[in-house]
Regions:
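A short glycine-rich, Lys/Arg-flanked "PGG" loop and its adjoining helix->strand segment in the class I
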Residues: 143-155
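N-terminal, positively charged/glycine-rich alpha-helical extensions of SAM-dependent methyltransferases
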Residues: 1-31, 180, 191
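Conserved alpha-helix/loop element of class I SAM-dependent methyltransferases that forms part
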Residues: 41-61
């Protein structure tokens, strides 16, 4: 495996969008988990559990989590016996993740590495699965991200994405959009969150790919047996693809 980049290593200046997002997520890192629970009414735990089951992760296996953040998804995937490497460009988020890993007694089984989703600092054909949760809306190149995740997993391994989606159920979709675009920033303001960040998150969905487009992106990365599952009325989608071999 290539040498991971230490958390305190100086990097070249990233593109403006990347740097802006890195700073923004750094600001919300201390309260990120709390606001996830608040804004999703606690459903994000159920979503991750479902997505983790799609990984078909073997006992004692090795997982890769892209956009690891505070390590919730990685912990869900690896269970009590697995190991993981988590990659994220935001050091404050990973510091919050390290604190959580220590509290859960999993610090020795999960390595957090500074890096970008489009250029993962890991060797190929190495991981039993690669996951990403609520990250793709923030990357600069989704095709390249999936290509890197596909490169990293061993033949037969799965790539799994968990993301916010646009509901298609008549009657529910307008209610979701009202909540997501209008009420969630208001809740952030009322409960002392970063209003700018929680205004960005709804905006990011407007320009995000459809389910079909994400599936096509997986296929362009060489993944097969691509499919998706809608959760919570279609407000969340889990995409799954398999590396041939």
């Amino acid at each position: 495996m290539s040498q991971p980049e230490p958390l305190n290593t100086q990097r070249c200046s990233p593109p403006p969008k990347r740097e802006t997002l890195r700073v923004m997520f750094g600001r919300i890192a201390p309260g990120y988990d709390r606001f996830n629970t608040l804004l999703s009414f606690g459903q994000h735990h159920r979503w991750r559990r479902f997505a983790a089951r799609q990984c078909r992760f073997p006992p004692g296996g090795l997982a890769l989590d892209v956009g690891v953040g505070t390590a919730d998804f990685a912990l869900e995937v690896i269970g009590k016996t697995g190991r993981a490497i988590g990659v994220d460009p935001c050091e404050p988020m990973m510091r919050a993740g390290v604190e959580k890993l220590c509290r859960r007694g999993a610090r020795e089984r999960v390595l957090l590495v500074a890096g970008e989703a489009e250029h993962l600092p890991v060797a190929g054909d190495r991981f039993d699965c690669a996951t990403t949760g609520f990250t793709l809306r923030n990357v600069t190149d989704i095709d390249q991200t999936f290509a890197e995740m596909a490169r990293a997993v061993r033949p037969g391994g799965r790539v799994v994405s968990l993301e916010i989606a646009k509901p298609r159920i008549p009657g529910f979709a307008p209610l979701f959009f009202l909540y997501f675009y209008r009420l969630s920033p208001l809740l952030a303001r009322l409960f002392g969150g970063d209003v700018e960040a929680y205004q960005y998150l709804p905006r990011s969905l407007k320009e995000f790919q459809s389910r079909e487009e994400l599936a096509d992106s997986m296929r362009r990365a060489g993944l097969i047996e691509v499919r998706w599952y809608d959760l919570s009325g279609g407000s969340v989608a889990v995409h799954v693809g398999t590396k041939p071999g």
